[in-house]
Design a protein with these regions (language model features):
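Active-site-proximal alpha-helix that buttresses catalytic centers in soluble enzyme cores
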Residues: 2-3, 8-69
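Cofactor-binding loop segments of dinucleotide-utilizing enzymes, especially the Rossmann-like FAD-
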Residues: 4, 77, 151
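Short, active-site-adjacent cap segments at secondary-structure transitions
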Residues: 8, 54-56, 80-81, 154-156
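Hydrophobic/basic alpha-helical segments enriched in Actinobacteria
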Residues: 46, 99, 119, 136-139
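Active-site-adjacent alpha-helix immediately C-terminal to a catalytic or transition-state-stabilizing loop
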Residues: 56, 127-156
């Protein structure tokens, strides 16, 4: 599992959630290239990414550094948690919300206002990753290696 590189939203302290067109910034581009280089000698057989812009950008930059071509597949199963009303808001502002302390101390118990529960996001992602492990095993055998590019809360 690889988290996407730093984005313009991360740098601005904004909870991006599933907002479209959130791009990597220069630091995020460098991070993605570095991860790709560190995986260069790993025989990756499958590359999967959340369909959001920042994860696709990360995956493409990472893939360009691998020692062989690996096709990229976008999978909604590993997309970011739907933060609902919190999406696009500054983290400083959100830290004043009563739900914030629960998000920090017991995230699996949280459902975001007009959004998704963290446990639901986790179940969705785990199911998707298990499916990819099975697919990769069938297509590439027991030595298959799947790299999934996703989001911090999904990876946690």
């Amino acid at each position: 599992m690889v988290r996407h590189g730093r984005t313009t939203a991360n740098a601005a302290g904004v909870l991006a959630g599933r907002l479209p067109n959130i791009h990597l910034d220069d630091a995020g581009i460098a991070q993605a290239v570095t991860v790709g280089r560190s995986l260069r000698s790993v025989p990756v057989t499958h590359l999967v990414a959340s369909p959001l812009t920042r994860t696709v950008e990360t995956a493409k930059l990472l893939a360009a550094e691998l020692d062989r071509p690996v096709p990229l597949t976008k999978d909604k199963g590993v997309v970011e948690c739907d933060y609902g009303d919190w999406s696009g808001k500054k983290l400083k502002r959100l830290s004043n919300e009563p739900l914030w302390s629960i998000v920090q101390s017991h995230p699996s118990s949280v459902t975001f206002p007009n959004g998704e529960s963290m446990s639901g996001a986790q179940q969705r992602a785990v199911s998707s990753i298990r499916r990819w492990v099975q697919v990769a095993g069938k297509e590439s055998g027991p030595n298959a290696i799947v790299v999934v590019v996703s989001h911090a809360d999904v990876i946690k």
